């Protein structure tokens, strides 16, 4: 078990996680940021919904080269992933949108709970959400809020 865990990257939900190790892992990863985030040896615990919504929140395109991330962009991404994942643990489901006044995240219908993941249109700006295969999974991005030339 210890050897298996040693192959995992830092887990954003763990207080003892080393973000510097995650940063180094991303900088050493060839290929797209969106694919790198699904690689559990780079950062542990990120699945497709977390990838889509965290990249959206940070305005980062999934196809951007992982090694092109600046340290400031990485720091924001690390914090955002930890926040979204932590809320999901607390709520028992993934809700990335801010609930309307007077409603809790848990009251938001499942099909309205995310900005771009499995959405036809971006829930922030209304642009059609692009989707394509990346890292063996479907990637989602808003062409307005996550332009391909974002890095």
Regions found by a protein language model. Give the residues of each.
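Intrinsically disordered or highly flexible coil/loop and linker segments, enriched in small
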Residues: 31, 64, 90-94
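RNA substrate-recognition surfaces in RNA-acting enzymes
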Residues: 59-68, 74
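Gly/Ser/Thr-rich beta-alpha loop segments that engage phosphate groups in nucleotides
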Residues: 49, 61, 138
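Basic, amphipathic alpha-helical segments enriched in Lys/Arg and hydrophobic/aromatic residues
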Residues: 73-90
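Phosphate/anion-contacting hairpin/loop surfaces
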Residues: 1-57, 65
């Amino acid at each position: 078990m210890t050897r298996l865990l040693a192959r995992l990257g830092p887990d954003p939900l763990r207080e003892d996680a080393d973000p510097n190790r995650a940063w180094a892992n991303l900088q050493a990863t060839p290929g797209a940021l969106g694919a790198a985030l699904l690689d559990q040896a780079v950062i542990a615990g990120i699945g497709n919904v977390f990838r889509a919504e965290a990249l959206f929140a940070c305005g980062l395109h999934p196809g951007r080269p992982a090694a092109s991330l600046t340290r400031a962009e990485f720091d924001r991404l690390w914090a955002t992933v930890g926040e979204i994942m932590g809320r999901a643990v607390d709520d028992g489901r993934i809700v990335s949108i801010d609930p309307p006044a007077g409603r809790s995240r848990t009251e938001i219908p499942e099909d309205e709970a995310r900005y771009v993941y499995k959405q036809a249109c971006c829930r922030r700006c209304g642009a059609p959400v692009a989707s394509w295969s990346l890292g063996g999974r479907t990637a989602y991005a808003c062409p307005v809020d996550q332009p391909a030339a974002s890095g």
